[in-house]
Amino acid sequence: LWSLSVSVTRGAGGYKAGPDSERVRATLRLLNAVSHTEVIDGRNITVVYLYGRTADGQSMAVRTEPQPPWFQVVEPPDTMVAQLEAHAEVRATRPERLWVDGTERDCLRVEVWHPGKVPQLRDWLRASELVVLAADIPFHFRYIYDHDLGGCVTVEGEMLEKRGWSCPVIGAATLAPAETFTAPLRVLSFDVENSLLDRRLFCLCLTVHDGGELVAEQMLDGGEAGIIASFTAAIAKHDPDVITGYNIDGYDLPLLEERAKLHGMKLMLGRDGSEADQRSNRTWAVRGRVVADAWWNVKREIRPRQESLNAVAKQLLGREKHDVNPQQMD
């Protein structure tokens, strides 16, 4: 599907066909970075994927070259070095000289097989009263820091065939910072209406804006399973960079997940076909997309006296919702 070459003018932030049939080059404004687990040589390895958008509105994912998670230990005794080198989760170690607390000190760099093992090793070492450095950085951020990347990057590599993905994927051979630019984002906003008696879905309405221009609007109704299937299909079709709505973190997304489970379905909203994932702080993670709850942003930026959708719409847009009695919705 993506056998053409892609190249860009420096700083243009877009892509175009080139003469090479395999190599591609693109400049992206990054949306987010996500850790994916892949089986490489029979072992689960974490690989960072960068998601972004070009200046001319093409969303893409970048599979980076695998790199091991790592941290540093300040002046570990020889007995601890031996234990680390023999540990099943430790991939490799090497000595380093680092500037710590105003002086140069002997340290040990510890590379592990999986980032999920770093907290366990970190806590074990700290329990032995050792100083551990760089062990609190999420793995996908670690990749960005280690490669000195900013908000925009230029990537060169080959297009990868990824079944179930809603955007093209580049396998990065080289990755470098690029001149800053603003990319037009595709934003999907949705709202769910449901029964107050048994929580059944009545309908789901959505709109899609691309670069600020309305390009699609749709109302999904009928049976619950059909509404959920049509919604996930709409996400895959329109491939939004941002999913938004009013209180979707606290209501709409949890409700959709609840009703999907009731029907033996999964809420597949990620660009890689993965499920939406609710975090412990009530926010949601969708791979390759930004979930931006309008309620949280209004609360943080505007701090309105009243936080209801009706009050905020009136304050910002000069419009109010249709006056529907919730008790009569069923």
Pin down the residues of each PLM region:
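The two-metal-ion catalytic cores of nucleic-acid processing enzymes
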Residues: 1-330
